[in-house]
Each structure stands twice: as C-alpha cells, then as structure tokens.
C-alpha cells in the first residue's frame, strides 16, 4: 500500500485548502496498473482520483439523508488538450490546450460509503464514480470544439468574479488537477 503524506496549502486571500500528493514513479505505476487492470486499459489515474474526491466529499456531507436517487455532483477538472489537437490546429488554438471540463457524477446516494464498509463496497463505489467521470471527460476530450468552449467559460467566470467578487464568495468546489504526464 502506498503511504501518502498530503501537504495542506492555504492562501490568505481566499483560504482554499489543497492537498499536494507527490508520488514516486513506482507508486504512480502501481496505481495506474491497478486502475487499468480493475476497470480497463482506457481508464487513467485521473478518473480514479476524481471518483475518490467525490466519495471523500460525500463522506463529510452532513445531510446524507437528504440525498435522493437522482441527485448528482458537478465539478470542473483540468484537461490537458495538447495531445488531442490535430497538428495543423496546434499553433492556432493555444487557449484550448489546458482548459476545464465539467465532470458529472450521478446517483450520489449509491456512492455513500464509510471506511467501516467492506473493501468490495468501497471499490464498487469508486468504480461507478470513475466510470461516470470517464464518460463525461471523454465527451470533452474527444470533441475538440469542447476544449475551446471550456476556456471561454473560464474566461467569462473570471471576468465576472473580478467585476463582482461577492458573487462567488460562498461557492466551494473540490478541484482536481492532473497535468496528464502520469497518464501516458
């Protein structure tokens, strides 16, 4: 088992909390191999990380009984689009290289697990959430027009928040970022 020592990062301006996990090459390979063996070769460590983030967030959610079957979770994740753009587009679409993609995880009630649950129950929830993440992320990755759209959405939100910072004051979203080098 890989032992991770997260480092908490805070910023006095917005006080976000972040955890940076630095894995050595062997640890990354072990995780990637496990993901590809358990789910299928097309899955990456980012899908598992997105699933684990949502499940961990649900574990801290105080109103679990209020979740209904159709409830879902949406968050943005970073997409490294460089490897998906055609060579003739690379010089013209720099803004679309690194952009955000909304990930939608459905049926949250089915993902409510606890550390006291059996390993099979926890793994099943991770698999289900990872499949949701992959389905949504693939939609953005394989449609090149979506990469540029994501960038425009972030530019719009940035412009709005600079004009009216109070607009997003009470908004909080888990944010997962992976450059993609660990997925090749």
From Swiss-Prot:
The UniProt entry, under Pfam families, shows: Tri3
Looking at the keywords, is Acyltransferase present? yes
Hey, which pathway is this one from? Mycotoxin biosynthesis
Q: Which GO terms describe its biological process?
A: mycotoxin biosynthetic process
What Gene3D superfamilies does this protein map onto?
Nonribosomal peptide synthetase, condensation domain
Q: Which GO terms describe its molecular function?
A: acetyltransferase activity
InterPro entries recorded: Tri3/Sat12/Sat16/Mac1 (IPR009992)
Q: Might you give the EC number(s) for this enzyme?
A: 2.3.1.-
Enzyme class comes to transferase
Q: Which domain of life is it from?
A: Eukaryota
Q: In which residues is substrate bound?
A: 154
Task: Could you list this entry's UniProt keywords, alphabetically sorted.
Answer: Acyltransferase, Transferase
Another remark in the UniProt entry says: Trichothecenes are sesquiterpenoid toxins that act by inhibiting protein biosynthesis.
* Record function comment: Trichothecene 15-O-acetyltransferase; part of the satratoxin SC2 cluster involved in the biosynthesis of satratoxins, trichothecene mycotoxins that are associated with human food poisonings. Satratoxins are suggested to be made by products of multiple gene clusters (SC1, SC2 and SC3) that encode 21 proteins in all, including polyketide synthases, acetyltransferases, and other enzymes expected to modify the trichothecene skeleton. SC1 encodes 10 proteins, SAT1 to SAT10.
The family line of this record is: Belongs to the trichothecene O-acetyltransferase family.
Protein's name in the database: Trichothecene 15-O-acetyltransferase SAT16
Tell me what organism the protein belongs to: Stachybotrys chartarum (strain CBS 109288 / IBT 7711)
């Amino acid at each position: 088992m890989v032992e991770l020592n997260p480092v908490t990062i805070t910023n006095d301006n917005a006080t976000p909390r972040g955890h940076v996990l630095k894995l050595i090459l062997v640890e990354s390979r072990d995780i990637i191999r496990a993901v590809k063996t358990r789910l299928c070769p097309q899955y990456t460590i980012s899908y598992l990380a997105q699933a684990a983030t949502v499940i961990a967030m649900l574990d801290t959610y105080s109103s679990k009984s209020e979740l209904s079957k159709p409830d879902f979770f949406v968050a943005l994740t970073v997409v490294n689009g460089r490897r998906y753009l055609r060579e003739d587009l690379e010089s013209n679409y720099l803004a679309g290289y690194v952009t955000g993609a909304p990930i939608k995880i459905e049926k949250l009630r089915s993902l409510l697990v606890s550390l006291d649950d059996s390993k099979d129950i926890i793994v099943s929830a991770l698999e289900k959430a990872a499949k949701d993440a992959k389905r949504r992320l693939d939609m953005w990755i394989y449609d090149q027009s979506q990469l540029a759209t994501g960038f425009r959405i972030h530019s719009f939100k940035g412009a709005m928040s600079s004009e009216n910072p109070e607009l997003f004051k009470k908004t909080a979203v888990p944010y997962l970022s992976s450059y993609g080098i660990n997925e090749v």
